[in-house]
Every structure is written in C-alpha cells, then in structure tokens.
Amino acid sequence: MTITTLKPETAAQAADAVRWALSAGEPLEILGSGSRRGLGRPVQAGHALDLSGLSGVVAYESEELVLTALAGTPMATIRDMLADRGQHLAFEPPAIDGDGCGEGGGTLGGLIASGLAGPRRISAGSARDHTLGIAGVSGRGEAYKGGGKVVKNVTGYDMPKLMAGSFGTLTALTEITVKVLPAPEDTATLLLFGLDDAAAVGLLDRALRSPYEVSGAAHLPAGIAARSGVAGVAGAGGAVTLVRVEGFGPSVAARVAMLREELRADAVLDRGCSLAVWREVRDAVWFGGVAAGGPHPNPPPLGGGGDSAALAPDSLPCPVGEGWGGGNRSDTPHLWKLSVPPSAGPATVAAIRRTLDVEVFYDWGGGLVWMEAPPESATAIRGALSAGGHAMLVRAPDAVRAATEVFQPLPGPLMALSRRVKDGFDPKGILNPGRMYAGL
C-alpha cells in the first residue's frame, strides 16, 4: 500500500489534517519517529500523520518538577535537558528503538501514547502517573486541552491519563506536560546467586516489603544472566536475582548494608555496573532489545562491591542495537510481555513450558514476565494466565500481528466500554484504526 505522509509543523496544521481526513473518510496512521510502529496491530491507512515536525520544549520548570514539550520532541533532547538539572523521568521508560541511552527513545508523544514503563514502575509508578496535561486533536477534528502544568493540579486529571497507553487511537497528541523528578545521586544492586524462579520471587517480595525503599526487583534465570554485559552478573555461573537501592549516597550505603545482611546477598554492584545491568533489564536486551555490547568495564568482584568511583556515570557506554524491531524476520522468535500477580509468575511460566519451549526473565518483583516464544503461541500463553493476568505480543511479523490479538482480549463489558470511549473521541474511526483491537 502506498502511504501519503502529512507532516504538520504546528498544532493548527495538525488539526486541519485531522479535519480533512474526517471529511474525506480517510483513516490516519499517527506517527512520531516511528520507533513504536511495530507495537500493536498494523494500521491499515493510506495516509500517515507525521507529528515529528511538532518539536521543541515549550516550558521546563525544574523547581516545579514539570516539563511541557511538543509531542514530536525527541526523547534524546528531553533526556539531555533533564540530565543538566539532575532530573529524569522516574518511570524509567524502555529504549525500544536501539538507543541504549535514550529515556524511552523516539518522541515524547510516542512514549506517552505507548504507556510503557521500566523497572522503577514498582516504586515510581507508570507513564500514566507522570502525565499531567495534554493537548491534541480528537477524531472529531476538535483541538482541546486536558490537565494542567503543575504537579498538584487535578483539573481534567483523568483526560491525560486516558491518553497514556491509548496508542494514538483516541487523539493525535500535539503537546504533553509530564512530571519530572530528581535523579538518584547513587545506586547499588544486591546480587543473589543460584535461586530458582519461585524462591527468587519470594525473596523479591521480602525485599519489596522491607522498609529499605527498593526501586528495582528482577530475576535472571541462568541462561539470561550468562548473556549479561556486566561481568559480575555473567560470571555468576547460574541464575542471578537483582535488588536495587537508589537515593543519596549515605542512605544507599546504609540500606544496602542492612539488606545484604537480611537477604544474605552474595555480592553488590556499584553505581556504574548497576546502571548497566538495569539498562539491560529495562530494554530486554537479551530478547532483541538494545545489544548489550560485551562485558561491562570495571566489574566488581563476585564476592563484594566495586569501586563506585571506577566509572563516571557520563562515561557509561550507550549500547546500540536494533531495538525491539526485526519482527518481520521469519527467524525471530516472538516476544511477549506478561503482567501477572507476582506470586503467580513462576507457576504461569511452568504451565507454559509444559507445551512450549520459552525463555524468560522476571521484573517488577515477578509481576512482569518477559518471554521469547515460538510462533503460534498465543493460545497456550493466554490459557496459562491466572485471573487478572494479561499478555501483550510485543514483537512478531506484521502478518502475525494483524491476525493475532496483540493485547489481552477484553471481556464483553470492557470491550463495550472501550467502544464507547473510542466513539466519544473518534466516532468515524479515523485515528490509528485497529491498532489495539480489530474493528476499534
């Protein structure tokens, strides 16, 4: 299909483009940089609305912990601006486009529309929790704003949150206001070796229930740990369980000491190696995310911590790879993201392994399972989910994503509600039609 691209340079031009599409009955594929084009179902549209021309930071009030930018602003620009003030996006968005140093990669609009969050979600919340305000154009051709530009403002509070994770099916976003937070001064990661999945998830639960403010809790089975670019993890010779602590330097040191004794940890990674291994977890590098790039320099000894000054944070390598793309290659396994009650994670994986050969690792204390699986696995994977769990097909060829429920199938009442919401914003179905569910 030949696609005609419309590239507005102002919000008014974006509104005009949507109004034209509405009057002509032409569906639009909403794009920024295109880094998340492989997420969700392929959009069947003859026209693309490229919002990358709406770029630039509108306002950055670091003292108020608020940043407003146009939707097409590259995340690399935002990352660098925040870093200059010692701030960041606390929900730790994954870099899915191969930019290992990008806070989510791509553009701000794509980041919020996809709603993805990284390991720190367990303590800092999701992308939705950090979205304060939006401006955009609905499928009715109406330009509107929702939310506010201060952290305590609750006017229109639900509208911005509705857009986070909507994958451009409700509104073509033109401007977004997000909450930013101080980046942690220091970070350290406790390592525990040789635990099976169930024991590891139980230990992570203990760590998260402790008073020590754990900000990352992941488990890497032996095959995954061996492929880490951090020598202290790859050299463990088996499974590795990770517990991260962040904050002011003295506080981190004190909490690590207490946690190490309580959990009987085998080793501690210093700041440099902690940043490296959590990038790997965040970006699912072992499953075709950003290439790990080999053992990390200055690894700590396996029996203890390392020199926290051995590697300055700005000298960390930025691993570069193909991201979560490459899904159209026939030899690429399908990538799934399973959200489950943490205690149910290992049993869910065990049930799936009765019929499928899969590879996994756990994040969010066991509540997030990253899984590489062979083709035609959807029925087995979703059949093993416990009540309340859901599975998203993150990477697969276009033809598979067009024929498979990429997101967890919704029960009848929830699907009816989703249709009413879609009809309220986009009654003619011109914005990213079918991106999340067929016919929606």
Stretches with model-predicted labels:
Residues 113, 132-293, 327-332:
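C-terminal substrate-binding/cap subdomain adjacent to the FAD-binding core in PCMH-type
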Residues 39-45, 52, 267-293, 328-440:
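Conserved glycine-rich FAD pyrophosphate-binding loop
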Residues 303-305, 321-325:
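Glycine-biased, low-complexity coil/linker segments
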Residues 32, 243, 371:
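Residue-level signal for inorganic ion chemistry
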